A protein has these predicted regions:
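Conserved catalytic-core segment of NTP-binding enzymes
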Residues: 141, 162-176, 190-296
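Short glycine-rich anion-binding loops that position phosphate/pyrophosphate groups of nucleotides
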Residues: 186-188
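Exposed alpha-helical structural elements
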Residues: 10, 21, 75, 289-290
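N-terminal accessory targeting/assembly segments
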Residues: 1-20
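Generic N-terminal initiation segments characterized by hydrophobic and/or small/turn-forming residues
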Residues: 2-5, 33, 248
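Residue-level signal for pocket-adjacent positions within structured domains
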Residues: 2-3, 21, 27, 91, ...
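Primarily NTPase-proximal linker/entry elements flanking Walker-type ATP/GTP-binding cores
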Residues: 16-174, 178-183
Length: 297
């Protein structure tokens, strides 16, 4: 397994605990019976994998057991792993768009790790050899980060119209031939109508001023908020088209099951996971490795 998965096992977070619980349940059984199924179901639900997702995992597992005539509990683990990997794997859409120019809108509620994610994403794009510019309405943190990392930050004063910031950032990115423009957005979900109008306006500005640019809209969700992250995915998904999810704060949480739920319930690929505070701690989401982490591989 790669570095990111060892990060999880070091932390003994969600992965270690769920892995232990699953193997305890399976190893305690001499045969594959209804009691084993009930215990597995309970284990998944208590690991913050939602009820609906758990039901679809269990349904798939029962079919798999029947079709493959599985009678040994040890083989149940492999079947379970395949089913869970299938749920979170969205194929090619898992990758960040590699085209240039690219405009990335980053949305999510304040405090969920949005600003940090933007900084880490900019760092990642630069490491991949792409030129980067940031557009931010007020984030002082981003300005400091940009100065440290030699990335241009186009900003307006606190409370400025985000669309005006996007407009200026686009003009600057076009003039400099920048590969990737990453734009922050306001993080208020309280007033959905305002948020919707704001995002629509930003999208209209990009459509009009930068029609040749490829687009990504990334939703940042804090894994430690558990079920709240699911409702945020729903709310933001109703407001705008989301091309991918960034799941942050996965290093110290027992709530990692939320990744499985979000990937299953919404047709949105998880593109990145945040596994620490460091600049390198934004990892591409690799379904096999992520689920492998649960099964301690």
């Amino acid at each position: 397994r790669g570095k990111e998965m060892s990060l999880f096992s070091e932390k003994k977070s969600f992965f270690g605990r769920l892995s232990e619980k699953i193997s305890d349940v399976i190893m305690a059984r001499a045969s594959v019976d209804e009691e084993l199924m009930d215990e597995l179901e309970e284990t998944l639900i208590t690991s913050d994998i939602g009820m609906d997702t758990t039901m679809s995992i269990m349904e798939g597992l029962r079919k798999n057991i029947k079709n493959n005539n599985i009678t040994e509990p040890a083989k149940v683990t492999k079947a379970l792993k395949e089913i869970m990997t299938g749920l979170v794997d969205k194929g090619d859409r898992q990758k960040l768009c590699g085209e240039s120019p690219l405009v990335v809108l980053v949305i999510g509620i304040n405090g969920g790790g949005k600003t940090t994610t933007i900084g880490k994403l900019a760092h990642k794009c630069r490491k991949d050899g792409r030129t980067v510019m940031l557009g931010a309405a007020a984030a002082e943190q981003l300005v400091i980060w940009g100065q440290r990392n030699n990335v241009n930050v186009i900003r307006h004063r606190e409370g400025a119209d985000p669309s005006a910031v996007v407009y200026d950032a686009i003009q600057s990115a076009k003039a400099k031939g920048t590969d990737v423009l990453i734009c922050d957005t306001a993080g208020r979900l309280q007033n959905k109508k305002n948020l919707m109008e704001e995002l629509e306006k930003m999208n209209r500005v990009i459509d009009r001023e930068f029609p040749e640019a490829a687009r990504e809209t990334l939703l940042v969700l804090d894994a430690t908020t558990g079920k709240n992250a699911v409702s945020q995915a729903q709310e933001f998904g109703n407001v705008t088209d989301i091309t991918g999810i960034v799941l942050t704060k996965l290093d110290g949480t027992a709530k990692g099951g939320i990744a499985v739920t979000v990937a299953d319930q919404f047709d949105m690929p998880i593109k990145f996971i945040g596994v620490g505070e460091g600049i390198e701690d934004l990892k591409e989401f690799v379904p096999e490795e992520f689920i492998g982490g649960i099964f301690d591989e």
